[in-house]
Amino acid sequence: MSRSNNANAPTPSNRRRNLSLVRGRRLTYSPPDAASAQRASPPRSAPRAAPRRVHAVGDPGAPLRASYALPNGVYNLHGDAHFNPPEEDDDILFVDTAAEQARQRAVNLHEAVNRHERLRRELGERMTRSPTLLNYSPSYSPTSPRSRSPDLIMPEDLQPAREQPLAPFNDSDDDERLLEQVMLESAEAPQLPQAPPAPQVDVSVLCHICSCTFTDIQNYNSNFVTSTECNHAVCFKCYVSIVFGKESYKCSICNRTTISCRAYNRDGYVELSTMSTVRDSQAIKRHWAQLSDSNMPHSNEMTTIQELQAELAELRAATARAHHDVNMARSDSQLLRQQLDVKEAELAHESNARLKLQKQNETLSANNLSLQHQLNTQVIESRVKMEQFKRQHDEFMEKFKLSLS
């Protein structure tokens, strides 16, 4: 009973053992007559439904707006992406992507179980239609101790626990392939969605000896070496300084001594121990020369980058000066425009004053002409009166003279 349960239990070890026995073991059969030796063509397994291809239209990160089920696959429309509308006989689905994937996984699992049960029924019917006796080879006889080992699976072990034992079946390559297909179908497991990778977090770690800070990715890598005795960690350069010229490592925190230390990464750890020490003050120079040749960017590129950066700084400074000059010119132009407006206002005021003075001058000129005309008239009248007075005076004097004589 325990062997039957182990054979039917879907554990990885049992599946591997079953497949190895099915591939490696060869069963020989003796048909009773030639008529029964003629084989019928083995039934073909039902064709599997080809999975529909899912096409994403637009940005996959955008919300799902519509889903079109077409003969060549399913088109998921995301966001505001444009998609030609399907024909009238096409199905338009508005579904949730996660729920649709879960439903598809359940349908695939149900179809796999149905195929498995159908193949088992077909195998049982074939066994029932052609009852023959099994002839085991000597090394696999039922009475052999090896055949009773828990690693050997008998034909009755392949049946479900509640079914009757099936009759032995005839030998053929088709039967073995059918049995192997049944075992492979039973070994298939539903595909589960893979978990997303853990986010990488940069963490700053301090060395207590040199007080240097290193930035490592948490749970991914480490620049520190750990003692196997005390689990106190130091940076790699401090570890090299401590073990230089020594066969053991002495922790500077708890003074424990150990021969090996550990360096960790995401895959595990590496045991480190001192093999040999060579004192050579020129070795570090040669090492840095190799680094300069192979592990550093080209000096010409760095020089070009520096020159371009300096030129960029000069251009930025020139641009700033040009902007300043433009701003100053704009200020001067605005000031000159204001002065021009003031001068134009003063000119307009002076023009108005000149017009007023011109009018006053014209008025005064007219008055002057009138006064001059009056003066001329008075002068003429005075001259006439003077001549008349002179003539009268002359006449009076003559009369006076005549009167005196």
From Swiss-Prot:
Main location (coarse class): host cell
CC terms in the record's Gene Ontology section: host cell nucleus
SUPFAM superfamilies to which the protein is assigned, alphabetical: RING/U-box
One GO molecular-function entry: transferase activity
Biased composition (Polar residues): 1-12
GO BP term, pick one: symbiont-mediated perturbation of host ubiquitin-like protein modification
Protein name (record): E3 ubiquitin-protein ligase IE2
Gene for this chain: IE2
